Amino acid sequence: MSLFPAYEIFARQLQDTGILSDAWVDGRPRFRLQGVVLSLAQAHALKRAAERIGAIYQELIDLLWGHPEWLDTFFGLTPYQKLMWLSAQGRWHGIARADLFLCRDGRVQCCEVNSDTPSGEAEAVLLNRLLHPYHGDVHDPNRGLASAFWRMLVTSHGGRQPRTVGVVYPTELPEDLSMIAIYRQWLEARGCQVVLGSPYNLHACRAGVAMFGEPLDLVIRHYKTDWWGEREVVWTDAAPYRDPDPLEGPLRLLLEAEYNGHVTVVNPFGAVVTQNKLSLALMWEAIERFSPLARRWIRRYIPATYRLTQMTLDDVANHRQMWVLKSAYGCEGDETVCGPYVSDEEWRDTLASALPEFWICQRFFSVAPEPNGRNPNYGVYLVGGRSAGFYTRLSVAATDEEAITAPTYVVRRGI
């Protein structure tokens, strides 16, 4: 293994890609140059787990399609969330990221799957590419991510290559600009015209739907499903959203164009259900409705998860070390509270403030840390149902905004 470059030199190399320019956050390095190197057995176990978890979600979708009453009785979806689900007709997947952990006892556990607007692709691909020469004879598992992404888009588009692709994202937020940029690079390399904009830039045209005057064949939707629908607060003491109403005009325009076969949307709006963490609770609360194989995989990979409404609050309050609280659509570090990492007071305050119908309780599991004590979160990209790469973040406790990203490699030989 070669000596790593100085971080400032690496940061300039990163900037030279034209994709990633923010190598620091609040003065701290965002990245670790030393990669995580997985054994063949570890990589296989993680990839296999991600694909099996994807299959569990597909079975959940099939179950829910046969039990539409669960949209109300279990998920409590809003009218526009139900519109998204029903319009998608069971379609939910294009690209997802399963966040997996290797535990001290050897298990692989999945805390959640981002099936709606997964991010990190730029960091995963570019870090691996730039730092590969410093890691000796290892395999870069992210080399094929761009090709897998393209094959998925073509398949989603009925086997036809899209000509004009609109990438719809929250243009006022900078967090995922690198991902938008690398998507654009991948698509333009395939000969596509790429148009960037927000839902408010969509408009009707003779061909179906357009953005800035350009008719679109395909839309990559990097705008969360819970932002397209009605916005709901999840805390008893939270002020209502200033913009709680659904994006009715853009949403109806896109759904109608897709229904009429004028545009393909990836990820499909059916992700409004799979992204909802109550889906994890459904796996456990209705486990007997799943196939025997899916039951075995749920017990193997998904920590016991239940709706907070089904729990005895005093029992949860008194067993902080056993549980993690998560809101239905919250992100890591945002509306996720790990019992072992907070005080008794913070835990009880969370339970007192949380609106139970929007929360789940998930069993805490102990992660096998790296030698330096950080906990690796192995994000496995699932593209068209197949594992296609890794996005690894290292954190002191739960994965949050202070986690650092490291390249991920796999040994070429050995165990």
For the regions a protein language model found, what residue spans apply to each?
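Preference for protein termini
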Residues: 1-415
